[in-house]
Amino acid sequence: MPRQPRNTSGIKHRAGELRKISTPAEAKLWDCLRRNKINGVSFRRQHAVDKYITDFCSPREKLIIELDGSQHGGDMDAERTRFLMERGYKVIRFWNEDVIKDIENVLLVIRQALEK
């Protein structure tokens, strides 16, 4: 399998900055994902995949989790999802509000995605 091209320093820097300013929903989900808590799977937070920075990514499982707030949606998210899927990733999306109010269901969906 060909290796993914190295991230540019600008993307890496931006990903590092985003890790410092997590939303409440990102922080809550990260607490559930970190240290391989779900099915023993390792996730990375604010991980760059080519030209995009993903909210959460398991490179080994090729699974990306995106959290959406009011600033997301539309053609740009569709293009981003298409781009990532073309590179073999499965992308699942949740609304920030769902993570805050119904984390158990969010975790169930993630577990199901990992089992497929």
Predicted regions and their residues:
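Basic, amphipathic alpha-helical patches used to engage nucleic acids or provide basic targeting signals
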Residues: 18, 22, 47-113
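Solvent-exposed, charged helical/coil patches
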Residues: 1-41, 115-116
